[in-house]
Amino acid sequence: MKQTMITILGPTASGKTSLAAALASKINNLDAASWGGTTQGAEIISADSRQVYRGMDIGTGKDLEDYTVDGKLIPYHLIDICEPGTKYNLFEYQQDFYDAYLDIRKRGVLPILCGGTGLYIESVLKGYHLSPVPQNQELRDRLADKNLDELTVMLKELKT
């Protein structure tokens, strides 16, 4: 069976990154022909909603030193791609994931999806179909002063 991606998931600080990096290192040191593989190495794609932010290294489990195995840096993607305070959502993650995934596969490399943000992982593994939705400031302003009961009534009216 041809593998198109390996996924490693789990909670924060459970050793996912070091496992993914060690696995990528092993794959990178193999000759694909020797094991019947079709890939030339491996790279890691992060699936973490907080590691996308630059400078947020403490408390996010962004152990960048884990990406160096036996003195060689394992290439990684979707880490440190946004400034703190920038809104980054599931739609954007999914688009960035597909860009990284397609680039990696195009080069004949095996992607390793690694992280603990379940919704990010599920969105790519199950192929969620998402659409960009522009911000509607007028609607936000109209709803900002409503309490929960008023919002609930409005939602029920929309459903009927």
Predicted features and spans:
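Phosphate/pyrophosphate-binding catalytic cores of soluble transferases and nucleic-acid-acting enzymes
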Residues: 1-160
